[in-house]
């Protein structure tokens, strides 16, 4: 009889615990649903970093502040030997690479603070000291490749073309010639010594699908910021428009 009482007591304990666990599970499920509904129905950030609910954008902004505070403009990304670079560089994204593009008429347009616009040919850019960088190119989708690029340091380019006042601004913006793709980049990142205006890949001229005649290579950022086929560059103290930030991605996208 005593053994039966013990068994009944144990069974009641298990039943009570199961009931409590069941209630907690459904409370958590309900709380998760309410949180999802709150996020889903929250207003969108309709600024230049739109395309995402405001609470999520605020979270990304906090991440951006942390990454910016930790960023050291003079710290170099790890580089590799040229023999480690892949021969077949992955092509990812063709927005802004208009097939009707006429390379023979292309000139880089640099819009200065005073309203003047510089128009610079590829041959003129190639007269500046050449810099090569071999690094682990990282895509925000999760893949990476060791790649080899050649061109002109952005900081050298800025000095050569008298952009001292522009370099005091907080951001640089870049567009493709057809203005279909565009990025905004914080000035410390674009002045980092490994950031180049790139005209070579694996020791040869850029292919069309990699942004010929000139693209941006910025090793401290994910691939979405490495704009292919630069048409124009401008400067601002406000965040420039950014294609993927407008579609819900992080604006800073550094790593």
Enumerate the language-model features and the residues they cover.
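N-terminal secretory signal peptides
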Residues: 1-14, 26-29
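Structured, non-membrane catalytic/scaffold regions adjacent to prosthetic-group chemistry
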Residues: 15-18, 36-255
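N-terminal export signals
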Residues: 20-38
């Amino acid at each position: 009889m005593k053994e039966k009482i013990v068994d009944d007591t144990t069974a009641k304990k298990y039943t009570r615990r199961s009931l409590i666990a069941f209630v907690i599970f459904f409370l958590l499920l309900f709380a998760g649903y309410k949180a999802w509904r709150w996020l889903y129905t929250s207003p969108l950030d309709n600024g230049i970093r739109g395309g995402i609910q405001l609470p999520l954008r605020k979270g990304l902004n906090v991440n951006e502040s942390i990454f910016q505070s930790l960023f050291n403009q003079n710290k170099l990304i790890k580089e590799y030997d040229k023999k480690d670079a892949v021969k077949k560089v992955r092509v990812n994204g063709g927005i802004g690479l208009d097939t009707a593009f006429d390379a023979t008429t292309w000139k880089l347009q640099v819009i200065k603070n005073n309203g003047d616009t510089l128009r610079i040919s590829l041959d003129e850019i190639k007269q500046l000291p050449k810099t090569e960088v071999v690094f682990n190119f990282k895509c925000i989708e999760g893949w990476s490749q060791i790649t080899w690029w050649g061109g002109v340091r952005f900081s050298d380019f800025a000095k050569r073309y008298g952009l001292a006042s522009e370099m005091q601004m907080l951001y640089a913006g870049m567009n493709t010639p057809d203005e279909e793709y565009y990025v905004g980049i914080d000035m410390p990142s674009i002045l980092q010594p490994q950031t180049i205006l790139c005209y070579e890949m694996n020791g040869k001229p850029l292919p069309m699908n990699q942004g010929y005649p000139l693209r941006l290579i910025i090793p401290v950022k994910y691939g979405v910021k490495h704009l292919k086929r630069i048409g124009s560059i401008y400067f601002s103290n406000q965040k420039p428009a950014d294609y993927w930030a407008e579609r819900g991605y992080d604006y800073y996208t550094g790593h």
